[in-house]
Amino acid sequence: MQENSPLLQLQNVGYLAGDAKILNNINFSLRAGEFKLITGPSGCGKSTLLKIVASLISPTSGTLLFEGEDVSTLKPEIYRQQVSYCAQTPTLFGDTVYDNLIFPWQIRNRQPDPAIFLDFLERFALPDSILTKNIAELSGGEKQRISLIRNLQFMPKVLLLDEITSALDESNKHNVNEMIHRYVREQNIAVLWVTHDKDEINHADKVITLQPHAGEMQEARYELA
């Protein structure tokens, strides 16, 4: 891939649910280090679009490219190691935080490195002792941070975020947002973030707005007044 070529490209992507047109003629690209938001009213297809980019569902029309290759021709497990998806409600499993953090290592058949765990816990303002904590005892903010750490350990090229702070209080929301922005800037990770949070617009390179009913889009560069 040439330097500064798009990591992701959506070309005329559409999605039908039965006879209902959810998305129509979606076209945009995402480059390394670029930060784009997806906004729009409820029911306009924001989460559906993110799931298509995450390769959790397939578009009914159009093409999704990753580094110039059609995602439908790539092995899903390889693609998802490069394009990481964080849902609005984090799904944690096993008994402890440690169980969740070793999972990315296990699927790669690699020996977990505790030093990496500890570095991420420090970055995301969590104590070392949380590794042995039962996931049922975690707060909403802690669960979301553990989910992010699990997804970021192997530095994906693209991070997909689906309203991940919508259920958090203002203090936790601010902390999680700042941690994400700081880390992705350091690592030059591309971000596609579905959100209703107007404060996040200040961080965006561009804002993709989906229209209701037809699921069509507009893309604009955000400029501070």
UniProtKB/Swiss-Prot annotation:
Q: What does this protein do?
A: Part of the ABC transporter complex FetAB, which is probably involved in iron export and enhances resistance to H(2)O(2)-mediated oxidative stress. Probably responsible for energy coupling to the transport system.
Q: Which family does it belong to?
A: Belongs to the ABC transporter superfamily.
Q: Which domain of life is it from?
A: Bacteria
Residues spanning the signal sequence = none
Q: Provide an example Pfam family for this protein.
A: ABC_tran
Q: What class of enzyme is it?
A: translocase
| Coiled-coil region | none
Q: Where is the ABC transporter domain?
A: 8-225
* InterPro entries with a match to the protein in the record: AAA+_ATPase, ABC_transporter-like_ATP-bd, ABC_transporter-like_CS, P-loop_NTPase
Keyword NAD in record: no
Residues crossing the lipid bilayer are none
Where is it localised? Cell inner membrane
Chief location bin: membrane
Q: One GO MF term, please?
A: ATP hydrolysis activity
Q: What is this protein called?
A: Probable iron export ATP-binding protein FetA
One GO BP annotation is: iron ion transport
The disruption phenotype is: Mutant exhibits increased sensitivity to H(2)O(2) stress.
* Assembly and oligomerization: The complex is composed of two ATP-binding proteins (FetA) and two transmembrane proteins (FetB).
Q: Which organism is it from?
A: Escherichia coli (strain K12)
